[in-house]
Amino acid sequence: KKVNIQAVKKPDTAVQMYKDGQLDTANISSTEAIYKANKNSKDVVDSPEATTAYLNYNESGSVKALTNTKIRQALNLATDRGGIVKAAIDTGSKAASALVPTGLETLEDGTDLSEYVSQDYTYDAKQAAKLFKEGLAELGEKSITLTITADSDTPVAKASVDYIKQTWEDVLPGLKVEEKFVTFKQRLQDSKTQNFDVVLSLWGGDYPEGSTFYGLFTSDSAYNYGKFSDATYDAAYQKALTTDALDPAAAADDYKAAEKALYDNAHYNPLYFRSTKALQNSSIKGLVRNSTGLQVDFTYAYKDK
């Protein structure tokens, strides 16, 4: 048997090729318009992803305002995640309540790890404004300007940042938000060198276990772009890898403690769990879509004639 894979740059072109019978599957979650136009098709299938979108805050010291915990907490509280998903990225994604996404790992009692470790990441404009005012006073400032960096080649990134800018500025008097869009490659480079204030990042799990996400933010991790160091977080993560490595339930408790440390100190800002849907020819059988690792497995796939 033979699998023909075509690289189609434009998502709308791929969808049209699918409808014309030139392709057997096509992603419909690339843009809101494509998703809305096709989400009710009988050919829609889930294409699971263990991917979380989140904001990194530069805590290295080069951005004075973001070294203040209350400022970061205020930004988190001023983030309307449900609003972002609905208004900016209506492509099947869901508001995030943790670093680890739904569908990555299921515990022995059937609980999703993401639900088990989730924290109270809620939108609270009043509390956000209060903490922001207190943070400004601690900094000796009356106003601050923060720049959000994101990918220029992703429509969803532009829509998300626009929405965040609007809500942050509406909720937090004294805050001005600027936007900076760069290529994916440049965004990664800027992240690695702390050439950012706030940066929109995405991470997809490599394997179905919590450490594929919680390894990101240890003090010595190359992916800890914000350069924060949290002893409680580090200890919880190390316990999951060592003492509790053979006890999934205990490791889940460790990951929950790690998530709480992130939440309490607002070291990052979870936005949404990315979900992808696709159109797939109903005659295609045995095609396996995984959330981690080999995302599309053709091993047992065949076309029913």
Which residues make up each language-model segment?
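Extracytoplasmic/peripheral linker and loop segments enriched in polar/acidic and small residues
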Residues: V85, G174-R187, Y214-N281, K305
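Ligand/substrate-recognition segments at binding pockets and active sites
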Residues: K133-G205, T276
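Short helices/loops that flank or line small-molecule/ion binding pockets
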Residues: D12-L23, K36-N40, T69-K70, D162-D170, ...
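Structural transition elements
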Residues: A95-E134, P155-A157, L246
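Ligand-binding "clamshell"
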Residues: Y35-P48, N195, E209-N224, N281-K285
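Long beta-strand-rich cores associated with HINT superfamily self-processing modules
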Residues: A278-K305
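Extracellular/periplasmic solute-recognition and catalytic clefts
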Residues: N4-V63, K86-A87
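Alpha-helical secondary-structure segments
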Residues: K2, T51-A98, I144-P155, A245-D264
